[in-house]
Amino acid sequence: MLPSEPPVSHATLRRPRVLLVDDDPSVIRALWRVLRKHRPQFTVNAASGAAQAIEALSDLTYDVVLTDLQMPGGGGRAVLEALILHHPETARVLHSSQLGSLDPFHRQQAHAVLAKPASEAEIIAAIDSALLRVASEPARRVG
């Protein structure tokens, strides 16, 4: 069963923002549909790779970034590292079919980790959990 209400995010005067990052357009569309269905109040943007995601992060503040791990251009690791260094207040969710290749440091730095394919309930639970974890953390910068 899906929770009916998402946790409160850092966005108090605007709709929570989610950035979806995946080089597979069908995955982006599927994630987008899940969020539209279960979290219609979220503003959802997408990036097709690490470089585009990092650029998007410089343009807007996001509450959650859900990124694939394996992508060209540094992949999800590059996105995760940019979030850790420059946007520690942003919830970080990793989504991949190759989680076995995720090193302990990156696994620890993610607020939630999802194996592909994930169910709608797992996706929403991961995003909600990541938002709650960030809300309970003191703001910090690594590095």
Kindly give the residue locations of the regions a language model identified:
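Hydrophobic/aromatic residues positioned on beta-strands within the core alpha/beta folds
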Residues: 95-96
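Receiver (REC) domain active-site loop signature in two-component systems and cognate sites
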Residues: 71
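Active-site beta3 strand of CheY-like receiver
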Residues: 60-66
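C-terminal output helix
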Residues: 118-130, 135
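Two-component/phosphorelay signaling modules centered on CheY-like receiver
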Residues: 25-45
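Active-site residues of response regulator receiver
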Residues: 22, 68
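Conserved phosphotransfer cores of two-component systems
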Residues: 38-39, 58-60, 82-90, 106-108
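Helix N-cap/capping motif at the beta->alpha junctions
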Residues: 46-55, 76
